[in-house]
Amino acid sequence: MEINMKNITKVGLSALAGSLAFTAVHAGDVSISGSMIASYTKKGGKTTTGNPLGMNKELTVTGSGELDNGVSVAYKQTITNAMGYNDSELVFTGVPMLGDATLALTSTGSPIDAIDDKTPIAFEEASAAVGSLKDVSGGNGAYGIRYTLADAFGSGVKVDAFYTPGTGDASAEKGVAGVTGSQEDTYEVTLTGAVPMVDGLEFGLGHSHTDHHNDTADTADSQDSDEGTAYLKYSIGGLSLGAQRSVDNTSGTGEVLYDTEYYGVSYAISDNLSVSYNTIESTKSDSTMGNDESGTEQDFDSISLSYTSGGMTIGILDADCSNCNYSNSVDESARAIQMT
C-alpha cells in the first residue's frame, strides 16, 4: 500500500486550520529586551586578525495574548545589528486535541540544530572561532511548523518535531520565499531527556531528512541529505562529561559523508567561575573524488573559561584547529575574550 504524504500533510494542515479558526485576540502584554556583546579576538596560523574589536547587539520584541477559544498566543521578533528584522516566531498553546504540546510557526531555529553540540562548555564551542565545521542543522534558518511536547507520556522525554515546506525565511502574507529551487521539504525530530534510574545522565537523539526534487539531473541538486546525532552527558557535583557523534550524509550522484565526534569536560570551580576543555574530530569522505576511502580529518581543541559577576559575564577562549575547512596542512588558532 502506498501512502501519499503530501495528501496527509494537506489533511493535517486543514484540520489544524479548522481548530485554529478564531475571531479575536484579547489584549496582551508587549515587551522589548536586548543584549550586547563586546569582544576582542586575535587569530593566528593561516588567518590574519585585522581589527580584533567587535560588538554584537540585538533587540527582541515579545508579545502575548489569548484568543476567544482559550488558545494562548506568544509572538517574538528579533532585530539585528543592521536594524533589520531577523527571526520571528508565533507560538500557540492550549490548542484543541494537542494537550500540553505547543505549536509554532517559526524561523528561530530547528530542533536538531539546537543539539548540534551538547558537550559541556564553560564559554564557547571548540569550533566557534576557528575552522569551518559541517555539523547537523536540519531546517535551521527556514520558516516552518514546530511541534514540541515537553514531557511525553510522563516519561520526562521531550519530543521536538519540525517541518519545513521548502527552504526560505519568513515571507510576507500570501508570499513565498526560497533559497534554492532544488531543495524541497525538510522533516526532523529530536528526543531529549534524563536517562531513567541514572542520576545526572542525560541523552539526546535527532534525525533530519531533506528532499531534493531534481532526481534525474547529474548535479548536486539531485542529492537528498540525511543528518543524525546522538549524545550522552553526565554531571556529578560541579563536574560534567559529554560525548556526541553526528553524521551528515548527502547522496545521489555521489556521496559526501561528514562523520564527527565531540568530547568535552567542564568543571564549576565556584558559583561564578567555570572552566572546560573540548575537542572535535570531523572526517569528510567524498566518493565523487574517485576514492570511497578518501577522507580529511579536521581537528579542534579548545580551553574556555567563564566568569559571572552580577549581570555581567566574561568569557575567554583559546582554540586551535588543524586541517581546517577539511583542507590538509591548513592550521588556525584564535584567542578571544568577550564581555556580555
Name each region found by the language model.
Residues 1-340:
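Outer-membrane beta-barrel proteins
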